[in-house]
């Protein structure tokens, strides 16, 4: 496949005002996408965004470009990424566009597209859009310009969709839940969803100002929610990231429940109800404890490359339904086409209600093995992973760890780093093993 110049694995992303994330590029991108998408379908595109201050600028530029290509645009305002995917399907739009940089700081932003079925846009269509970007922008004639409108009830539609994923025979009455919205796109949705299902909700990270998204709150910064769960004597906490496609949870003891543990809960619940299709897809970074816990239940487990895009690809290849990353991207293809933090939280709460169990009880049979990650910076064009010394040290460590341990060495896709990950039963031994391999990588650099 031809190498892509603009699109990465999750759309276009970068620092606002530099590189690709400029209003000029957004305008041209809207026009180029409009040219490609107008060749078939309804000529209707939905745009949603998170709460970054730059989102308004990019929204205006994109809608102008799409209109100039003859496409009608429907604006949603601040809405979670999975909400854009859902409403793209229900409105039978030709595509959905999300303006977000997910868990990144406010000064970054990004643009990604969903196809008409709510899945990530096909690689070939992205290549066609890139080809159009190389051409001069030519506006359609005035009578062919696209119209721009707003979806006034987008919030209500998505809240009802989320609630529809919770079993009708149960409620959340009696549960006290802390919900951290990361000052992001779920701020006006997630607390309402859980309140309307009956829970007492304490919302934090629900006051976006355009520049505080993901700032010491949300799924990538768990300190605040852990403190709040303990201070409020809450039953659990749900932390979402800036665009709502990622979730981490907290039990009543203030302990973090990560994506691997959430996958375990969902797989166990599905198996107990006889609805588990196949097994579970994790990634190369998934904790070995998840693998071993699923083995004990005779649930197959497979690993993809890191990234929810690759989890989705392997799920489709195996025809399985449940997969995700330890970072909190959770996919359940029976309940959506993309990662959805609110839906994942609802499914965990449903499992708690069905089994009349606490979050601690649902994860008690899964032992998370100590995992140490060391980043080693290197210089030059050579690959330290090809070093005989590094290979020898890795083999030595793997031999000592046996079946209750794991070593993973991989290059960062964005920085000159080698990521050294070691898992095993004993934290001090795992740390020593990781440092031993890291030293070998440094000496080979």
UniProtKB/Swiss-Prot annotation:
GO cellular component terms attached to this protein's record: cytosol
EC number(s) reported in the record: 5.4.2.10
Free-text description of this protein's post-translational modifications in UniProt: Activated by phosphorylation.
Superkingdom: Bacteria
Keywords: Isomerase, Magnesium, Metal-binding, Phosphoprotein
Cofactor needs: Mg(2+)
GO MF term set: magnesium ion binding; phosphoglucosamine mutase activity; phosphomannomutase activity
Reaction catalysed by this enzyme: alpha-D-glucosamine 1-phosphate = D-glucosamine 6-phosphate
Binding site for Mg(2+): 102, 241, 243, 245
CC cofactor note: Binds 1 Mg(2+) ion per subunit.
Residues at the active site: 102
Pfam families for this protein: PGM_PMM_I, PGM_PMM_II, PGM_PMM_III, PGM_PMM_IV
Alphabetical list of PROSITE patterns matching this protein: PGM_PMM
GO BP: carbohydrate metabolic process; peptidoglycan biosynthetic process; UDP-N-acetylglucosamine biosynthetic process
CDD domains: GlmM
Phosphoserine: modified positions: 102
Family: Belongs to the phosphohexose mutase family.
General function of this protein: Catalyzes the conversion of glucosamine-6-phosphate to glucosamine-1-phosphate.
Name of the featured protein: Phosphoglucosamine mutase
Provenance organism: Shewanella sp. (strain W3-18-1)
């Amino acid at each position: 496949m031809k190498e892509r110049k603009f699109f990465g694995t999750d759309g276009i992303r970068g620092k606002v005002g530099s590189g690709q994330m400029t209003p000029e590029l957004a305008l041209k991108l809207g026009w180029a996408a409009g040219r490609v998408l107008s060749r078939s379908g309804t000529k209707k595109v939905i745009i949603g965004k998170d709460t970054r201050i730059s989102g308004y600028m990019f929204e205006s530029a994109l809608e102008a470009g799409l209109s100039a290509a003859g496409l009608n645009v429907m604006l949603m305002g601040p809405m979670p990424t999975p909400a854009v995917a859902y409403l793209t399907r229900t409105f039978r739009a030709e595509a959905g566009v999300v303006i977000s940089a997910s868990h990144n700081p406010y000064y970054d932003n990004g643009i990604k597209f969903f196809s008409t079925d709510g899945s990530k846009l096909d690689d070939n269509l992205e290549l066609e859009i890139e080809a159009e970007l190389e051409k001069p922008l030519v506006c359609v004639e005035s009578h062919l310009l696209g119209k721009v409108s707003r979806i006034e009830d987008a919030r209500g539609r998505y809240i009802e969709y989320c609630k529809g994923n919770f079993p009708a025979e149960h409620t959340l009455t009696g549960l006290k839940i802390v919900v951290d919205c990361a000052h992001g796109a779920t701020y006006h949705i997630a607390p309402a969803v859980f309140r309307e299902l009956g829970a007492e909700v304490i919302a934090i990270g629900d006051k976006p100002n355009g520049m505080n998204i993901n700032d010491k709150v949300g799924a990538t910064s768990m300190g605040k929610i852990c403190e709040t769960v303990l201070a409020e004597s809450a039953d659990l906490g749900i932390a979402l990231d800036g665009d709502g496609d990622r979730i981490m949870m907290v039990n009543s003891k203030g302990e973090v429940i990560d994506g691997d543990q959430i996958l375990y809960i969902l797989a166990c619940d599905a198996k107990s109800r006889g609805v588990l299709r196949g097994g579970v897809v994790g990634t190369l970074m998934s904790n070995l404890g998840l693998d071993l816990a699923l083995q004990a239940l005779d649930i197959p487990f497979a690993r993809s490359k890191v990234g929810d895009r690759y989890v989705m690809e392997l799920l489709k290849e195996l025809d399985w339904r449940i997969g995700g990353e330890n970072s909190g991207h959770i996919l359940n293809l029976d309940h959506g086409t993309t990662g959805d933090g609110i839906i994942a939280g609802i499914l965990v709460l449903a499992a708690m209600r069905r089994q009349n169990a606490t979050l601690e009880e649902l994860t008690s049979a899964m032992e998370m093995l100590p995992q140490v990650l060391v980043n080693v910076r290197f210089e030059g064009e050579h690959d330290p992973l090809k070093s005989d010394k590094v290979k020898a040290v890795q083999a030595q460590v793997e031999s000592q760890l046996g079946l209750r341990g794991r070593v993973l060495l991989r290059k960062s896709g964005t920085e000159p780093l080698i990521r050294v990950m070691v898992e095993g039963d004993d934290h001090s031994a795992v740390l020593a093993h990781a440092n031993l391999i890291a030293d070998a990588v440094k000496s080979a650099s």
